[in-house]
Amino acid sequence: MVNKMDIIPEITRKSITDLINNKERIDGRSLHEFRDISIETGVISKAEGSSRVKLGNTQIIVGVKPQIGEPFPDTPEMGVILTNSELLPMASPTFEPGPPDERSVELSRVVDRCIRESRMIDLEKLCIIEGSKVWMLFLDLHIIDYDGNLFDAAVLATVAALLDTRIPAAEVEDGEVVINREKMQPLPVNRKALMCTFAKIGNEIVLDPSLEEEDILTARISIGVTEEGSICAMQKGGEGPLTRDDVLKAVSIAVEKVPQLIEYLDKSMTP
């Protein structure tokens, strides 16, 4: 496999790196600034919850489909979350049709981990009959435009879609589950959690790398943070190392930025 770093023109790599080492970026942002963000919910009429998020030119649509099914054997009293990501070929020339590749699998796992480990959804409240009937939440992520930093956009879109989701009341009568679609209710949400991704370029770490910056990074770290400021997920990428100071700096910035993102999310979802 050809290393991407080998085919990026040296002049491009050097110009971006020199700017960042001088505390500047090619799109005019500061080192620790997100691109413009927009959030829409209720964008898929056939889904019980959905969202469209744009982070710069990166665009993701997420749909949530609840279904009654069996719990996992080791958690018979808890509902189930299943996450699937589709990297549509129209989103990037590097995305190919066919079964999920390692990037799609990694994206699904990172989003799932951030939602699950943050305990965002109270899965015990999604249990209908312990050991046999629970709500299963199918999360479908569709990347329709890729311009860098899928993780942050995907987590934001997934959280927005979950907050938008309504499920019918489910009652047990004579051992059978009866669904009442006249009583739609929100998911049992404990808290919100979002993610901040950083790229190591030159001597600096930069927040929310664009595609051009991703192409030349030496290392990447994504940090999931709850609204209370607890770390709930972390993912390292790239072939290069990160120093202890790099990681601590990234964590500090993420803990500062996530409450701001959550405030923006809450405002975006207010009717």
UniProtKB/Swiss-Prot annotation:
InterPro entries associated with the record: ExoRNase_PH_dom1 (IPR001247), ExoRNase_PH_dom2 (IPR015847), ExoRNase_PH_dom2_sf (IPR036345), Exosome_comp_Rrp42_subfam (IPR050590), PNPase/RNase_PH_dom_sf (IPR027408), Ribosomal_Su5_D2-typ_SF (IPR020568), Rrp42_archaea (IPR020869)
Matches recorded under Pfam families: RNase_PH, RNase_PH_C
GO cellular component, one term: cytoplasmic exosome (RNase complex)
Location in or out of the cell: Cytoplasm
Keywords annotated in UniProt: Cytoplasm, Exosome
Main location: cytoplasm
Cross-referenced PANTHER family: EXOSOME COMPLEX COMPONENT RRP42, EXOSOME COMPLEX EXONUCLEASE RIBOSOMAL RNA PROCESSING PROTEIN
Function recorded in the entry: Non-catalytic component of the exosome, which is a complex involved in RNA degradation. Contributes to the structuring of the Rrp41 active site.
Family of this protein: Belongs to the RNase PH family. Rrp42 subfamily.
Protein name per Swiss-Prot or TrEMBL: Exosome complex component Rrp42
Gene of this entry: rrp42
